[in-house]
C-alpha cells in the first residue's frame, strides 16, 4: 500500500513543529487539503528550535501524532527525518535518511516491515548509488541554496538532469532545495516530476492555496 502511494506521490512537504506559532494541526490540515502527498516532520534549525531549544523526544512524538493523523485522513504518507527510533515509535510510513545517517539496511532492522526509506543525494555518484540501491526513493539537490541546509553548496539543476537521465521512473525521486512556484517550471524543464518543498508552503499566508498551485503545475507536467 505504501509503495503504491509513493509511486503516485508528486508533492512532498517538510515542516517543522511550528512551536512558535502553535498551529501545527491547522497547518497540516490546510497543506494536505491542498494536495500534499507526503508530509515530513523536520524540526532541525527551525524558528521553534532557535526559540525553545531542540525538540525533545516526547514532544516530537506528539507532533508526529498530529501529522500522522492528518496525513492518514487525506490518504497521504507521514515521514520522519533521520531518527529510525522515532519513526518506529510514531508508526511513520516513511523514514528519510541523509548521507551521514544510518545505512538503509541498519535502519530496516529498527523499522516496521512496511516502512519506506528515502535517501538524500547531492552529487552524481550519490544519485547513481541511490538509483541502484535499496532505498525506496531518493531526493536530489539542493537545486538552490536554502536556509534549511546552511553552508551546503547547491549542485543546482544540473544534478536534476543527471537524475532524470539515470533514474528515469524506475525508482521515485524528488528534486529538493529552494523550490517554489516561480522556480518550478525550471525544475520541470530539467526533468523532475516530483518535488520536495519547505518554505513555499510553510511560509505561505495561505498554505492550502500554495499547495494547490504547486500541485496543479505538477499534475499538468505529468
From Swiss-Prot:
Binds 1 Mg(2+) ion per subunit. This is Thiamine-phosphate synthase. Its EC number is 2.5.1.3. Its cofactor is Mg(2+). Pathway: Cofactor biosynthesis; thiamine diphosphate biosynthesis; thiamine phosphate from 4-amino-2-methyl-5-diphosphomethylpyrimidine and 4-methyl-5-(2-phosphoethyl)-thiazole: step 1/1. GO terms for cellular component: cytoplasm. InterPro entries: Aldolase_TIM, ThiamineP_synth_sf, ThiamineP_synth_TenI, TMP_synthase. It catalyses: 2-[(2R,5Z)-2-carboxy-4-methylthiazol-5(2H)-ylidene]ethyl phosphate + 4-amino-2-methyl-5-(diphosphooxymethyl)pyrimidine + 2 H(+) = thiamine phosphate + CO2 + diphosphate; 2-(2-carboxy-4-methylthiazol-5-yl)ethyl phosphate + 4-amino-2-methyl-5-(diphosphooxymethyl)pyrimidine + 2 H(+) = thiamine phosphate + CO2 + diphosphate; 4-methyl-5-(2-phosphooxyethyl)-thiazole + 4-amino-2-methyl-5-(diphosphooxymethyl)pyrimidine + H(+) = thiamine phosphate + diphosphate. One of its GO terms (molecular function) is magnesium ion binding. Mg(2+) binds at residues 82, 101. 4-amino-2-methyl-5-(diphosphooxymethyl)pyrimidine binds at residues 40-44, 81, 120, 149. GO terms for biological process: thiamine biosynthetic process; thiamine diphosphate biosynthetic process. The lineage of its organism: Bacteria, Bacillati, Actinomycetota, Actinomycetes, Mycobacteriales. 2-[(2R,5Z)-2-carboxy-4-methylthiazol-5(2H)-ylidene]ethyl phosphate binds at residues 146-148, 178. The gene is thiE. Disruption phenotype: Strains lacking this gene are shown to be attenuated in a mouse tuberculosis model. It is an enzyme of class 2 (transferase). It comes from Mycobacterium tuberculosis (strain ATCC 25618 / H37Rv). Belongs to the thiamine-phosphate synthase family.
